Amino acid sequence: MTSVDSQPDLSAAEAVLGAHVRDVMDFPKPGVVFKDITPLLSTPAAFGVVVGALADLARGLGATTIAGIEARGFLLAAPVADRVGAGIVPIRKQGKLPGRTRSEAYALEYGTAVLEIHEDAVPTGERVLIVDDVLATGGTAAAAHTLLRGCGADVVGLAVLMELTFLSGRDRTGTLDVTSIMKI
């Protein structure tokens, strides 16, 4: 489990994030409220604050690799990895990676999907932080965790911008330590 000492103060990042996320109703399906981070991405200073908070978390956890979940997780994982001098591992939707892969099916808030990772994505014992934009039902995070552990990674946590607490996604992440900048 994550120690209190390794947790950065996320209050500044939470305030910035709250001011730079917009709700899109009925996307991608009726009844779903999509959390659009485009305003965050298009505001360099705001994006920098959020990336900085995630990088501080990664450093505190001793992460040597950052795993980004397709697609918006890629937008966060790459600059975090750059800031901490870590490698990056893409966790992709089915059929998007060449070569030998591991696959894991999971349920979404609005359907089902499959994630994949290269079989040799991380060396055994590599300290990996998973980064994504939203923790909703927890299916994506749980699948990513399973894939990384299957490669032999030491998954040190999951960091997300937003956690939709009403969907109880944290309950599906098992022993995975979850850090969310903002809870909704």
Swiss-Prot record:
<dbReference type="GO" id="GO:0005737">
    <property type="term" value="C:cytoplasm"/>
</dbReference>
<comment type="subunit">
    <text>Homodimer.</text>
</comment>
<dbReference type="InterPro" id="IPR000836">
    <property type="entry name" value="PRibTrfase_dom"/>
</dbReference>
<dbReference type="GO" id="GO:0006166">
    <property type="term" value="P:purine ribonucleoside salvage"/>
</dbReference>
<dbReference type="Pfam" id="PF00156">
    <property type="entry name" value="Pribosyltran"/>
</dbReference>
<dbReference type="GO" id="GO:0002055">
    <property type="term" value="F:adenine binding"/>
</dbReference>
<dbReference type="InterPro" id="IPR050054">
    <property type="entry name" value="UPRTase/APRTase"/>
</dbReference>
<keyword id="KW-0328">Glycosyltransferase</keyword>
<dbReference type="GO" id="GO:0003999">
    <property type="term" value="F:adenine phosphoribosyltransferase activity"/>
</dbReference>
<dbReference type="InterPro" id="IPR005764">
    <property type="entry name" value="Ade_phspho_trans"/>
</dbReference>
<dbReference type="GO" id="GO:0016208">
    <property type="term" value="F:AMP binding"/>
</dbReference>
<dbReference type="InterPro" id="IPR029057">
    <property type="entry name" value="PRTase-like"/>
</dbReference>
<dbReference type="GO" id="GO:0006168">
    <property type="term" value="P:adenine salvage"/>
</dbReference>
<dbReference type="GO" id="GO:0044209">
    <property type="term" value="P:AMP salvage"/>
</dbReference>
<keyword id="KW-0660">Purine salvage</keyword>
<comment type="similarity">
    <text>Belongs to the purine/pyrimidine phosphoribosyltransferase family.</text>
</comment>
<comment type="function">
    <text>Catalyzes a salvage reaction resulting in the formation of AMP, that is energically less costly than de novo synthesis.</text>
</comment>
<keyword id="KW-0808">Transferase</keyword>
<comment type="pathway">
    <text>Purine metabolism; AMP biosynthesis via salvage pathway; AMP from adenine: step 1/1.</text>
</comment>
<keyword id="KW-0963">Cytoplasm</keyword>
<protein>
    <recommendedName>
        <fullName>Adenine phosphoribosyltransferase</fullName>
        <ecNumber>2.4.2.7</ecNumber>
    </recommendedName>
</protein>
